[in-house]
Curated annotation (Swiss-Prot):
Transcriptional activator which interacts with the mcb binding subunit complex formed by res2 and cdc10. Rep2 is required for the mitotic cell cycle start. This is Transcriptional activator protein rep2. A zinc finger (unnamed) spans 177-197. One of its GO terms (molecular function) is SAGA complex binding. GO terms for biological process: cell division; negative regulation of transcription by RNA polymerase II; transcription by RNA polymerase II.
Amino acid sequence: MHFADIPLSKPCLNNPPTYPWSSPILSSIANPSLCDIVSSPSSVSSFASSDDFAFMNAYCLPIQQNHQFGSPVAASPNQQPLVESQNRRNVTYASLVIGKLGIAQLIRQQTDPPQIIHRKQDKGLMARVLSRSKKQEERENHSSDARDAIKSALRRRMRRREGRVQKALRPTPNLICSKCNTTFNHSTALMMHEATCLNQVPFKLSDFFVEDVIDDWLF
């Protein structure tokens, strides 16, 4: 059977072709638009204006584009080497362009300023959230220690305050009379006592007894 006799509606299922555009890089890029991708204008324009899209077909047969009707037809045996070389050249060119487009798309995704800014903001927000949650967890784990420390600090403060109050409310020393050494708790009582005590004339009981004895002896 000749290649030209095989109908085009049945793709070759024995040995399916492996083309460069079935690489993983194209699976990660969903139909990139040429206007949004940073690439050289010459490659984009030449690739976009190419009329030979036979290499994008799923058939194993080498085909050529029928420009009159826009439908692919099988190549004749005489034109088969020329079509194969053209398809091979188109495949190479397509793989290079698609690789360039994919790399450009990836580079743009990584170097897009708004995305970088949002990524940094998200990282900063996540860091703040994690730090707050970590502090909250530490506070919950060590809440008893914190309460004990606060209570001890308050107790020390109350002791210092009580000491100052006790010093301020310390009672006055006892007041002592300079003549008879009598103690008093108030200065007014001491003054009244000294007014009478200092004006008294000193006397001895022996004087009274001696006078009585002399009077009795004389009479």
